Design a protein with these regions (language model features):
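Active-site pocket-lining/capping segments in soluble small-molecule metabolic enzymes
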Residues: 1-119, 137-138, 146-231, 238-713
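Conserved nucleotide-cofactor-binding alpha/beta core module
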Residues: 122-123
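Long, basic N-terminal domains or extensions that often function
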Residues: 134
Length: 713
């Protein structure tokens, strides 16, 4: 049976999810999760939530799926230890540094690769599995055949989103909220700029070309089960508890009854929340304008539907009762005893409670039926009496308070035993031994014991590199300025001028950030066809199997989202020779990185904001055959839309990052500073490099300092 995974943005939502049929819930506590604006949980609430779920057989997954700075990793280590101590069943991660930290501090807690890791190929999923990921959450953009292929070939469990909001950009690759509004989607603070109006190749007139409808894949659960999907994820940690109850309840029934939704159930899903209806476009491989939709700000609340939903979980309603057997012995001259038993993960579990010696009845004697009636009053608990047996001598009496007290004590004891049983079940042998020895069973190594090795001294001077969008931007004039590296998209290599003199400049082939399993052999063949590209830019975990064994120098691209020193160390261990730091970091944070790898930063150019599966150009003005378009926002700012590998388009920033006049750029311990050319002419490319190297007078018309000084939330 596939697992149904529901969102829990707060305790009310958690109760709603559990009581309407979730097999597992995902939730966050603290600041380090991809929905920081959700209510989330305090430490105490989280511990109570774990107990609440485990008692009812529901698993709890902690979301620590954001990018973290070096300082934040110290706090994250504490969160890891607390989560393990509370009995969390798995942890979702995005950050490469947190991945290595979790393996050292809580090595036996299962890790799940968040969709923020941007995994969408069989090769990438297998790399994640090789790193110890028990589960991989796939990108929402995959179609049914691509999911089927990954399920068939990956040893890790596969989780997919089946209902809820769709981002326009691939998860983990969106920088629009960060660059435009200083609120990072990679750090759980997305401001959702994709829901705002824009114009395409014209002024903004109120259209919403970046706003996708919510996904609804309720009609395809049967084929998901057949292809081997392990977990079905419902999106919605920012949504109300009533919404969680509605969608969880409907999907629970569909799974249990192995059927498609009725017209009424489909209507209820849409009534709970939608944006002009739903879409199944990605799953079916049918992209296009029909996938886009909006939701009015004053959309009415479905009061009747939500009232019905609340009735399913409010006021202590318990839909997931545990059947128990009760056996009471009331004998003359002996203390009364009550045994309660239920099935647990380790077989039958028994708990005993003992009371006083019964008295001789002065008038009416105690009956077995009276005992059954009082002991069966389990309201307010998770238990329900399924079997009852009484051994009762004649002529005895017990006060009602004693009977009720026996019931409370026995059921409370059973509750505690069940919670402990769940925790011990997922404890590893070494943890059980630590517990037996009276030591902390939750943490094998403290943070200090897992200190980073000393990094080499960074270089005193920074060399400049260039990346281009098109081959014609690489000219003799550019190479005459002797850039250390020139990054060229792999599909543009064959268009380079064969007569160029590269001198000591390294030619680095850039693999596409977004690709598919079917592209893996194609990309490898392109690399083999171009041995002159002695280096390869790696921007995704799925690139590693493509480049492995080719003997090329590997350089980490910005798509890896390197945010801390541990991430640099991780990628060094994967064979990289240099790596690009996230451009969300302030210059002080870049400076303070322990440079376990030669480090690069983008210091010029239009920063990439979104990379998309749905072409914003084709959906709005028709295909321009690679020429792209221009996106205009409400303020008149214009964002170029460029076209790349596989006809996937990318939104570039409206303003050009320019730091040539900022000396801090040279004080960060960087080995390389990258000049990122997108819309520049070949002449401008050479002029910009001269400006950065020799202090020329070239400046862009509309410039920004990026996040180098501002940083992000």
């Amino acid at each position: 049976m596939m697992e149904l995974l529901s969102p829990a943005g707060g305790f009310d939502s958690l109760i709603a999810a559990v009581q309407t049929g979730a097999d597992a819930v995902y939730m966050g506590f603290g600041a380090f999760n991809a929905r920081r604006s959700a209510k989330n949980f305090t430490d105490e609430e989280f511990a109570s939530a774990v107990s609440y779920c485990h008692l009812r057989g529901v698993r709890v997954f902690l979301t620590l799926n954001t990018l973290l700075t070096d300082r934040e990793l110290v706090q994250a280590a504490d969160a890891l230890k607390k989560a393990c101590a509370m009995g969390v069943d798995a942890i979702l991660v995005q950050d490469w540094g947190l991945l290595t930290l979790a393996r050292e501090i809580v090595p036996d807690v299962p890790l799940h690769a968040s969709t923020q890791m941007s995994l969408f190929t069989l090769g990438g999923a297998n790399e994640a599995a090789a790193l110890g990921m028990e589960r991989v959450v796939l990108a929402r953009e995959l179609n049914r055949d691509e999911v089927r292929e990954i399920c068939a070939g990956c040893p890790a469990e596969i989780e997919i989103f089946i209902h809820g909001a769709l981002c326009m950009c691939y998860s983990g690759q969106c920088e629009m909220s960060a660059v435009v509004g200083e609120r990072s989607g990679n750090r759980g603070a997305c401001a959702q700029p994709c829901r705002l109006p824009y114009g395409v190749d014209g002024p903004c007139r109120g259209g919403h070309p970046l706003s996708l409808k919510d996904a609804n894949l309720s009609a395809y659960l049967g084929e998901m089960a057949e292809m081997g999907v392990d977990c079905l994820k419902l999106e919605g940690r920012m949504k109300r508890p009533e919404y969680v109850a509605v969608i969880t309840g409907i999907y629970r029934r569909l799974l249990d009854e192995k059927r498609r939704p009725t017209a009424e159930e489909s209507r209820r899903l849409e009534q709970a929340f939608s944006r002009s209806g739903f879409t199944d476009g990605y799953w079916l491989g049918k992209k296009g304008p029909q996938m886009f939709g909006t939701r009015p700000e004053n959309a009415p609340e479905p009061k009747e539907l939500f009232a019905e939903a609340r009735a399913q979980y409010e006021n202590g309603r318990e839909n997931r009762r545990i059947p128990v057997s009760l056996a009471i012995r009331v004998q003359a001259g002996k203390p009364v005893s009550l045994a309660v038993a239920c099935q647990s993960n380790n077989g039958l579990m028994n708990v005993w409670a003992q009371g006083p010696v019964p008295e001789t009845a002065r008038s009416r004697a105690l009956t077995a039926e009276e005992l059954r009636e009082r002991l069966s009053k389990t309201g307010g608990t998770v238990f329900t009496v399924e079997q009852f047996r009484a051994e009762l001598d004649d002529g005895l009496m017990l006060p009602a308070s004693v009977i009720n007290g026996l019931r409370r004590d026995a059921l409370e004891g059973l509750k505690q035993r069940l919670e402990q049983d769940w925790f011990l079940r997922r404890m590893s042998p070494w943890q059980k031994e630590e517990l037996r020895q009276g030591r902390d069973p939750h943490v094998r190594r403290v943070l200090e014991a897992a200190a980073l090795p000393e990094a080499p001294e960074p270089p005193k001077t920074m060399r400049f590199t260039c990346s281009v969008l098109k081959a014609q931007q690489v000219t003799a004039a550019l190479l005459a300025e002797k850039p250390a590296i020139v990054y060229v998209p792999i599909e543009e290599l064959e268009r380079l001028d064969a007569g160029l003199d590269w001198g000591e400049t390294e030619l680095c082939a850039v693999l596409p950030r977004i690709f598919r399993t079917a592209d893996e052999p194609v990309l490898r063949q392109l690399l083999e066809r171009h041995p002159e590209a002695t280096a390869v830019a790696v921007g995704n975990l799925g690139h590693l199997p493509i480049v492995r064994g080719l003997g090329r120098t590997l350089r980490g691209d910005f798509g890896l989202n390197i945010f801390n020193s541990r991430a640099l160390l991780f990628w060094r261990e994967q064979g990289l020779s240099s790596a690009t730091a996230s451009f969300e970091l302030r210059w002080q944070q870049v400076r303070d990185l322990n440079k376990h790898l030669p480090c690069e930063a983008i210091v010029y150019g239009r920063l990439p904001l979104m990379v998309m599966e749905n072409c914003v150009t084709r959906c709005n003005v028709g295909c321009t055959h690679g020429a792209g378009s221009v996106l205009t926002d409400r303020t008149g700012a214009q964002f170029p839309v460029t076209c790349g590998y596989g006809c996937r388009c990318e939104i570039q920033n409206s303003r050009t990052l320019f730091l040539a006049d900022k000396p801090e750029m040279h004080r960060c311990g960087l080995t390389y500073g990258r000049l990122r050319f997108t819309t520049e002419t070949p002449e401008q490319c050479a002029a910009v490099l001269r400006r950065y190297k020799d202090g020329g007078d070239w400046t862009p018309d509309d410039m920004t300092r990026g996040l180098f000084y501002r940083g992000v939330e």
